Amino acid sequence: MAAKTHRTAAHPTVLSTRALNRATLDRQLLLRRSAMSAKDAVAHLLGLQAQNTKPPYFQLYARLTEFDPEELSALMESREVVRIVTLRSTLHTHTADDALTLRPLVQAARERELKTFRRGLEGVDLDRLAAVAEELVVERPRPVKELREELLAHWPDADPFALTVAARCLLPLVQVTPRGMWGRSGQVALTTVEHWLGRPAEPVPAPDATVLRYLGAFGPASVMDFQVWAELTRTKEVFERLRPRLLTFRDERGVELFDLPDAPRPDPGTPAPPRFLPEFDNLLLGHADRTRVIPAVNKGRNGVGNQAYGSVLIDGFFDAVWRVERDGGTAILTVQPLRNLVRDERAEITEEAARMLTAMTDATDHDVRFGTFLDYGD
């Protein structure tokens, strides 16, 4: 049964946190696994956060039926998907088409990022730096260390790290294969997305189409939700332009939410099976108000310091962390609950964990445990 959405212009329907949770999980392919291809899923989700090499594979395993990691690896090898810095200055796995459109959309944010490094770039002509770096990486993909040394030869008084950050911000650089491939990753080597794909990037697009796609994957959502996800500013006018095509709701705090008229909004009581998400899954990062997935009491509890861990969704909400260790041929998956779990929840989590270990590791034996490995210092 779908959630009720009766409303008037003066009194939009209020969507509860559970209603938002179920709607978002459905669109994120986490309420039930989808039969879509890996490439279609990467496009539907507007990319997979990929600052580490393995999480994109686990993101797709959590969302797709019969997912084979080699499918995504083959897409990388054929250059149908690429690893490129886009949203929130973070490396993402995108389809080739999205890499050529989303990067221009967020380019202004990447250039604003350079202000943080202006002291280390004193005396550096940024236009010339971009030209020099582009010539270097188009000649052949360059490891980061080599690119840094080449740039430092031109600007010996500049901060070496700031020079490579500037190249990354000014140019749409991709990490070429074998980096990021399943089971056979290599060092980071960079070239431009246009050179790697053999076609030019698109002109800077209007955000309208991206807003609609975002709502299809993360909605219902507010203007601020979109801005946090994309790291864009001044997009309220875009939502106003799209308003005649959208439905509007309110959350329990009174914040206006926008949504596609035909998007799924399941009944809040719809069962949500346990799902194991890797570190930095965009589900957990794609909104300004993350309480639709992360209970307030668990904010910031998917890691300690700079170390992030996987998140377990239990009844649709982040209520446990997980990690995998190897002991010889045994894969040991430890789940640390953040609340008391009933027997049925533990059984369902154990079953899902065992399936994941079978599909995503080459271990001959699996051991699923409930225990404590994170000390939050409470």
Where are these regions (language model features)?
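Long, low-complexity intrinsically disordered regions
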Residues: 1-290, 296-378
